[in-house]
Swiss-Prot record:
Signal peptide: none annotated. PROSITE patterns: CLPX_ZB. HAMAP family: ClpX. Keywords: ATP-binding, Chaperone, Metal-binding, Nucleotide-binding, Zinc. Residues 2-56 form the ClpX-type ZB domain. Component of the ClpX-ClpP complex. Forms a hexameric ring that, in the presence of ATP, binds to fourteen ClpP subunits assembled into a disk-like structure with a central cavity, resembling the structure of eukaryotic proteasomes. Zn(2+) binds at residues 15, 18, 37, 40. This is ATP-dependent Clp protease ATP-binding subunit ClpX. Belongs to the ClpX chaperone family. Disulfide bonds: none annotated. ATP-dependent specificity component of the Clp protease. It directs the protease to specific substrates. Can perform chaperone functions in the absence of ClpP. One of its GO terms (molecular function) is unfolded protein binding.
Amino acid sequence: MTDKRKDGSGKLLYCSFCGKSQHEVRKLIAGPSVYICDECVDLCNDIIREEIKEVAPHRERSALPTPHEIRTHLDDYVIGQEQAKKVLALAVYNHYKRLRNGDTSNGVELGKSNILLIGPTGSGKTLLAETLARLLDVPFTMADATTLTEAGYVGEDVENIIQKLLQKCDYDVQKAQRGIVYIDEIDKISRKSDNPSITRDVSGEGVQQALLKLIEGTVAAVPPQGGRKHPQQEFLQVDTSKILFICGGAFAGLDKVIANRVETGSGIGFGATVKAKSDKASEGELLSQVEPEDLIKFGLIPEFIGRLPVVATLNELSEEALIQILKEPKNALTKQYQALFNLEGVDLEFRDEALDAIARKAMARKTGARGLRSIVEAALLDTMYDLPSMEDVEKVVIDESVIAGQSKPLLIYGKPEAQASGE
């Protein structure tokens, strides 16, 4: 089809659908003996979009993945953390099964099971939540608990979390109510003492109190443009009882709280049992024994813990696990950089000793998997900067010395006589 203002005879043209002339519209598109204006095209698009929205609920009734299928999908993207993946797969399956059956089964009301992820930084908490949302094709948003404050104080309202979720699905309330919200750094809103405070803690216990109803399930009134700045606009009513909340945090020091409980034997005085250092459990083993009382001592209020009945603990990643993360997942870091280099027509090779060196460096930094990208980026920075301006480079090889900063990557050229290193 072509865009026309006048036909060959010089006659004024009109839209065949609405009858407007070419001077009343921006564009007039010509077909065989008919014309359609841009306004009618927009109207057709709106009609189609409305029909898609009506069909969408039927598509959502497609088969829900089983816990085994969810776990298998997580295995494709997340290395290790087997117990956490099992717990998450079952919790997510039960949550969406509950939604599909209208919150009831044979007259029994099914409760909501939000999830608490406990594990060191870089252990995969955020990645697990993102991967679940991608598998289930539901809206997903992340929030940082450290930026939240009680209503009326400077900072983000907890309702802003729901507003972000609505943004992810173009303010489609029905879609948002099937979404997943991941609240990171949840350990940072612990109260400063496990005793109730006489002073107001607006970013600690106050935020926990504000999150209670949101996480448990309430009808949140959310303005489409967010915040408290537009009091006159119409509010959207979002039922948060259908939204799955996953809270995650490193909980540094929680292992010591658990150790004080589990490693002190029975008895007092001369009858007390004192465990030797060799008998003491590792941090991962201790975290797997977490109880609600430990979280209360850490600084979470009992009511908040009660809203997060499913607890999954993640272990600190070993050097071997970091090497696997570098090369095995579908979106492994080495595969991502190889794809980037392929766009330049260049192959990228990571030798095994280079992967070992990257993992060792990340372990030394204590940043877990999150630190891997910065190490690889630093090693490849100069090469990626120069490569678009270079010719005849066929391959780039990364070895241990490159990661250690002792040499530049090996560049292999198409012409054997031009082979050079570190140019």
